[in-house]
């Protein structure tokens, strides 16, 4: 079905999924696609460290591509320090420097396999609470992010990582009031301090951390104004309507949309989703 939709589209489509391994396995959890679920990054590391992680990534990419998917919303490059932390089981659990090394090699491997990677969750979850169920506030100083959380993202950016997903954590050292996904300053840090020129996307705007902060459709408008190129939402209809309305009312400058579209098209070209003949200038 995805192949049919891809062939019917004038401009190639991005089809993405979360296939991290462990607790987040949107595809391999179904027996029709794989006999067993992909194991968590930490389980794979214990089996064979980095070589095993890269081989596991290749298997994931092969499976996803076989059913028409071209983006995996992975890897999780957060650096929690406590095994009790919400994000710990989804992370490598190996500290900032090792996570940075793994991230670099994994991004390169996914690119070689023509699978779009998405590093997450910028600016770093740390040991914070689950934003699926409420607002998480990070009180750590900015210097901590510079010496720990940012390292894997920097490593992945240097390796050519095409996408970064931004969390809904409120990080007080960057923005005291807004979730990171809706914060202009957090996006400024990503663009200017980390020199990232690729695609920036939100975590799901239907998550409770956002819903308890701002009304449904308004979240998407704030996300665009903050600097996101792509928006993820399991409740996308009202989000889309509010964005269109904001453009019509001049709340969102068309230039913002155009810049995002150019980045998305550039990535699609780089990953063979479209070729330049498909684009009318």
Identify the residue ranges that each predicted region occupies.
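Second-shell residues forming the walls of enzyme active-site clefts
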Residues: 1-7, 94, 98-245, 253-256, ...
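Glycine-rich, aromatic-flanked loop segments that form ligand/cofactor-binding clefts
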Residues: 2-36, 56-79, 99-124
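Glycine-rich, flexible loop/turn motifs
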Residues: 23, 29, 34, 40, ...
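A charged helix-plus-loop insertion that forms the helical arch/lid used to bind
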Residues: 32-47, 93
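A short small-residue
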Residues: 37-43, 82-89, 130-136, 242-246
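Glycine-rich anion/phosphate-binding loops
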Residues: 45-61, 97-101, 143-147
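Flexible hinge/switch segments at interdomain interfaces of large molecular machines
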Residues: 76-81, 122-127, 274-281
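Mid-to-C-terminal alpha-helical segments outside catalytic/metal-binding sites
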Residues: 248-276
